[in-house]
Regions:
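Canonical Radical SAM [4Fe-4S] cluster-binding loop centered on the CxxxCxxC motif
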Residues: 5-38
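Hydrophobic packing within well-folded, soluble alpha/beta domains
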Residues: 16, 20-23, 40, 47, ...
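A glycine- and small/hydrophobic-rich beta-loop-beta segment
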Residues: 163-164, 175-183
């Protein structure tokens, strides 16, 4: 299968500094390295000229964009500037991390029509016991509050996530806690 002409992936960074217990990405790809903003924006302009309308923004850790450059989050400015490029119809954000999520990114999502109310964020688990074992550096309460903020600040947001079961040390109680989260906090009932 090929990617349709109107659709493109834009990689904004390579690597990851997180070192979660189950993940080999930092070993394989190395430390997080952000691409220069001007280079990314020019790539998007060039793709628009070729007929691309929908952009999937990807990185192993999207929300960390820019931290390696000067210690500050720059994902919000990047996405805002990208949304202002004539011809960009849709922008979707993939592979965010819950720890230190830049909340102003939600404002851009809400305010810019072409930034979809869609976020792919890897939660992995909800049990504090499992989050610690996985070295996720976020708690159950922080995760629940984050999801609540997503829903309050961007009504109708679509959250895509991955949840990991069977990680070594997971108990029946941990699993039950995870199922409760997925039913109550992530899923919205359909009618």
């Amino acid at each position: 299968l090929t990617t349709p002409r109107h659709y493109a992936y834009v990689k904004i960074a390579e690597g990851c500094d997180r070192h979660c217990a189950y993940c080999a990405i930092p070993i394989i790809t190395g430390k997080h390295v952000s691409r220069p903003k001007a280079e990314i924006l020019q790539e998007v302009r060039d793709m628009v000229a070729e007929g691309v309308k929908e952009f999937q923004i990807i990185a192993q850790e999207l929300t960390y964009y820019g931290i390696d450059l000067d210690g500050k989050h720059h994902i919000t400015d990047l996405i805002s500037d990208m949304a202002d490029i004539p011809g960009v119809k849709w922008i979707r954000l993939h592979y965010a991390y819950p720890n230190q999520f830049p909340m102003d990114l939600l404002d851009v999502m809400r305010e810019k029509e072409n930034v979809c109310s869609y976020l792919d964020i890897a939660l992995q688990h909800i049990s504090d016991h499992m989050l610690t074992r996985m070295r996720r550096h976020v708690s159950k309460q922080e995760t629940i509050e984050l999801i609540k903020q997503f829903r309050e600040r961007v009504p109708g947001i679509h959250i895509r996530t991955t949840l990991m079961v069977g990680f070594p040390g997971e108990t029946d109680e941990d699993f039950a806690e995870l199922m409760e989260l997925s039913l109550i906090h992530i899923s919205e009932p359909t009618r």
